[in-house]
């Protein structure tokens, strides 16, 4: 669904309205530096999303609503942990990398999934404005210039469509 890792970590079951198939993004989890006299330290905070457009409602596809229904926990539980305990972004990134390594799937970041999601959405007919809203971007330019990556196979299909015109 193209969520940022901090948004995913901050997601509680109360943020998922299964009946109306809507996911609400209104918090993020992040690790911040608390540099003090003891040295460089960090702490986990729960805060508001990155920008005003990051507060959003995302329609949930039916197959995902069914999945959520099967695993739904208490409203105050975090989706990733299944409890009131947060899974912090760095820990989730480490888990993701470990799964990729164990499955010989290469070395990718969680954020790369956001790019893949955006590219797949465009290749499957999403309009850029809707995708930009789903991703929580301020402008469609951010979506197009940073998140949507050309694909040779998709380009070939489009070029072959031109042949039908002649």
Region roles according to the model:
Residues 1, 58, 73-86, 93-137, ...:
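Short, basic (Lys/Arg/His-rich) helix/loop patches that form interaction surfaces
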Residues 9, 25, 33-37, 69, ...:
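Extended hydrophobic-aromatic, low-complexity segments
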Residues 10-70:
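Conserved tyrosine-mediated DNA breakage-rejoining catalytic core shared by Y-recombinases
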Residues 63, 67, 91-98:
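Generic alpha-helical secondary structure signal
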Residues 35-39, 145, 149-166:
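DNA/chromatin major-groove-contacting recognition/catalytic segments
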Residues 10-16, 132-138, 146-148:
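A short, basic/aromatic helix-end/turn motif that makes direct DNA contacts
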């Amino acid at each position: 669904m193209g969520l940022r890792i901090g948004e995913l970590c901050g997601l509680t079951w109360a943020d998922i309205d299964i009946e109306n198939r809507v996911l609400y993004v209104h918090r993020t989890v992040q690790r911040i530096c608390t540099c003090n006299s003891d040295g460089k330290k960090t702490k986990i905070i729960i805060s508001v999303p990155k920008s005003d457009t990051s507060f959003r409602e995302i329609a949930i596809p039916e197959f995902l609503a069914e999945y959520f229904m099967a695993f739904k926990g208490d409203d105050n539980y975090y989706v990733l942990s299944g409890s009131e305990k947060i899974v912090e972004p760095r820990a989730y990134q480490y888990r993701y990398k470990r799964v990729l390594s164990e499955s010989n799937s290469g070395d990718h970041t969680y954020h790369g999934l956001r790019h893949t999601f955006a590219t797949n959405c465009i290749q499957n007919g999403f309009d850029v404005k809707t995708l930009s809203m789903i991703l929580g971007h301020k402008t469609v330019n951010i979506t197009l210039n940073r998140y949507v990556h050309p694909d040779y196979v998709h380009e070939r299909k489009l070029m072959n469509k031109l042949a039908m015109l002649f």
